[in-house]
Amino acid sequence: MERTTVDYGKLRRYMQRMFEVGLKYPEESAEITAKVLVEADARGHASHGVARVSMYAAEVWDGKNVPQAKPEIVHETPVYLVIQGNRAPGFPVSRTAMERTLEKAEENGTCMTVVRDSCHFGMAGYWAEQAADRGMIGWAFTNTLGAAIPLYSDRKSVV
């Protein structure tokens, strides 16, 4: 199979524009989404790169991913956050979650954050590296919408 080389910056700009214009993402949401997807491909994680665009588009068209939604903090302590995603795209929600988590961890020595009701956030390693870049340990996990239909079921529920 022949490989195609695409300029990183051009692909990132194209993807950002596609999310902004095609899927009505706000500029900042489109920017982080494009950045993480293209970075996944650049690192060899094609399963979490730009090939996922059709999945994110289908979620928007089905109303499962709401680009204009705003996440909100619903519970907060010095070492814990719960963020209600309100079906916002996972990438901008994760950026906010990691920024707040790392600020609290620097102040208090640790922090755990839970994001609920958001969408897939791409390559988990990207988010965990945010902690490593600041000399901390970070774990990043996500769930996603159902991807497979179990036997005798009428809807996708297995991820």
What are these model-derived regions, one by one?
Residues 1-23:
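Generic N-terminal amphipathic, Lys/Arg-enriched alpha-helix
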Residues 24-32, 47-49:
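Flexible, glycine/charged-enriched surface loops at secondary-structure junctions
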Residues 48-102:
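Active-site cofactor/substrate anionic-group-binding motifs, chiefly glycine-
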Residues 83-85, 106, 111-117, 138-142:
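General beta-strand structural signal in soluble alpha/beta enzymes
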Residues 87, 117-121, 142-148, 152:
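Acidic, glycine-rich active-site loops and adjacent beta-strand->loop/helix elements
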Residues 94-107, 114, 120:
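Glycine-rich beta-alpha loop segments
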Residues 158-159:
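Conserved small/polar residues in nucleotide/adenosyl-binding loops
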